[in-house]
UniProtKB/Swiss-Prot annotation:
Record Gene3D superfamilies: 3.30.230.10, GHMP kinase, C-terminal domain
Sequence intervals crossing the membrane: none
SUPFAM superfamilies: GHMP Kinase, C-terminal domain, Ribosomal protein S5 domain 2-like
Name of encoding gene: ispE
Alphabetical list of InterPro entries matching this protein: GHMP_kinase_C_dom (IPR013750), GHMP_kinase_C_sf (IPR036554), GHMP_kinase_N_dom (IPR006204), IspE (IPR004424), Ribosomal_Su5_D2-typ_SF (IPR020568), Ribsml_uS5_D2-typ_fold_subgr (IPR014721)
Organism annotation: Shewanella loihica (strain ATCC BAA-1088 / PV-4)
Protein name: 4-diphosphocytidyl-2-C-methyl-D-erythritol kinase
Coiled-coil boundaries: none
Annotated family: Belongs to the GHMP kinase family. IspE subfamily.
Binding site for ATP: 98-108
Active site, renumbered: 14, 140
Function: Catalyzes the phosphorylation of the position 2 hydroxy group of 4-diphosphocytidyl-2C-methyl-D-erythritol.
Group of enzyme by EC: transferase
One record GO biological process: terpenoid biosynthetic process
């Protein structure tokens, strides 16, 4: 069964280098402006294609997330239905990214599943078609499929590739799961940050409108930010809970990481404007 196993398909994390909430639409979704950048810290997926059409997932997450709710299986099923293929796959997930951390782990896993199976099943969908399927699974999935650092606005689906500084990051992972829906439903969330042009945004001070509310509701996030900001410019990514400090070199990040107090966990990663998934695809 595993002789045709295609291995080590990366599902990278992302950071929101800024996240501005510009308003709320009539349908309840929020108008955002944000900048996505990938980091070289990833989940990894293996795939073994079959002709039976069956889809199975092996993961230490099985006890945490029901298969019916798993975005990996939803992505594979969506690709089957969209293309009409009779092929299936056995999938293995090596989970390294924290869930509910604001670094896109579930969305990235779904994107890697779509990109890898489109290649392995030879269903030959375009990137735009894959992104359309991805958007039905989650607002962040298309950026992982496109594979380039991007400025996004709307609900996050309008993407413009950008070249952001590829800094080193120390990312702290508070042991708390932040609900995105809960954050965006918070009546005290700022929703009136003025919309700016991309040029203005790229030259202005960056912030995350969700950060003050999350820090107030989750002391673990506030603690991580308070410690990290003593050493480097620091912000929360997405709706949290992860926070990141920005460094020019790996050595600087490692120097601060070595001082990490008990009770805080994290990792060091490099920002990259081209997704490791896009690079993996070119190796075939």
């Amino acid at each position: 069964m595993t002789s045709n196993r295609s291995t080590a398909w990366p599902a990278p994390a992302k950071l929101n280098l800024f996240l501005h909430v510009n308003g709320r639409r009539a349908d309840g979704y929020h108008e955002l402006q944000t900048l996505f950048q990938f980091i070289d810290y990833c989940d990894y997926l293996d795939f073994a294609v079959n002709d039976s059409g069956s889809l199975t997932l092996h993961s230490e997450m099985e006890a945490v997330v029901a298969n019916s709710d798993n975005l990996i299986l939803k992505a594979a099923k969506s690709l089957q239905e969209y293309t009409g293929t009779h092929q299936g796959a056995e999938i293995w997930l090596d989970k390294k990214l924290p869930m509910g951390g604001g670094i896109g782990g579930g969305s990235s896993d779904a994107a890697t599943t779509l990109v890898a199976l489109n290649h392995l099943w030879q269903t030959q969908l375009s990137q735009d078609e894959l992104a359309k399927i991805g958007l039905s699974l989650g607002a962040d999935v298309p950026v992982f499929i496109n594979g380039l650092a991007a400025f996004a606005e709307g609900v996050g689906e309008k993407l413009i590739p950008v070249e952001a500084p590829e800094n080193w990051y120390l990312i702290l992972t508070p042991d708390v799961h932040v609900s995105t829906a809960e954050v965006f439903n918070d009546p005290l969330l700022p929703r009136d940050t003025p919309k700016l042009s991309m040029d203005d945004l790229m030259s202005s001070d960056w912030h995350n409108d969700c950060q003050p509310r999350v820090a107030e509701r989750y002391p673990q996030v506030a603690k991580a930010l308070a410690w990290l900001i003593e050493y480097a410019p620091s912000r929360m990514t997405g709706t949290g809970a992860c926070v990141f400090g920005i460094f020019d070199t790996r050595q600087q990040a490692e120097h601060v990481f070595a001082k990490l107090p008990a009770g805080l966990c994290g990792f060091i990663a490099k920002g990259t404007n081209k997704s490791p998934l896009a690079l993996r695809l070119t190796q075939h």
